[in-house]
Amino acid sequence: MLGVAAMVGGVHASVACTGISLTATDGSYIQARTIEWAYGPLKSEYVIIPRGQELQSYTPTGMNGLRFKARYGVVGLAVVEREFIAEGINEAGLSAGLFFFPRYGSYEGYDSAHNDHTLADLQVVQWMLTQCATIDEVKAAVERVRIVGLEKTAVVHWRIGDPTGRQVVIDSRW
């Protein structure tokens, strides 16, 4: 019987992430997540972005996309590059995370004529958390940018939550 269980429930690589949110009986609210990435090391590191820091987005042709200044301080967990925050929170209590979205999403085609408002998919969390304090601000802000994928990156989508428990998921179907 144990052999059958091992064959049926065998070990396999996982690339799924799970996001949860909980509200306690006292009304306090928390968001959490897992990161399961079987394709190799993500070179994860904690990052701190102070309010006022000047930032710029990558595009498929280099670091020549949207320029922005942090309105809010941010702490987060970056993967691969310091700019690619997978999960973070800002000083206003807004939290955001990116989640793998294979086979379901797609991005706008890259057009260098729009670099001044082009944002790399893996920098959306960094940008949202440095610019927005509420879900309503996030919804308005995403209408003003063009999100593009970087070469060799997976399509992702984003989960954003504020301290009141409001949440939104932004899919990458543009």
What are these regions, as identified by a protein language model?
Residues 7, 144-149:
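A short structural micro-motif
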Residues 1-10:
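Bacterial N-terminal signal peptides
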Residues 15-116, 152-154:
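A contiguous strand-loop segment
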Residues 3, 62-74, 131-143:
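Short, basic/low-complexity N-terminal boundary segments at the transition from targeting/disordered tails
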Residues 23, 114-146:
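Alpha/propeptide regions of enzymes that mature by internal proteolysis
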Residues 139, 150-158:
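Surface-exposed patches in mature extracellular/periplasmic domains of secreted proteins
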Residues 98, 133, 158-159:
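Noncatalytic scaffold domains of N-terminal-nucleophile
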Residues 155-174:
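Extended amphipathic alpha-helical segments with heptad-repeat/coiled-coil character used for oligomerization
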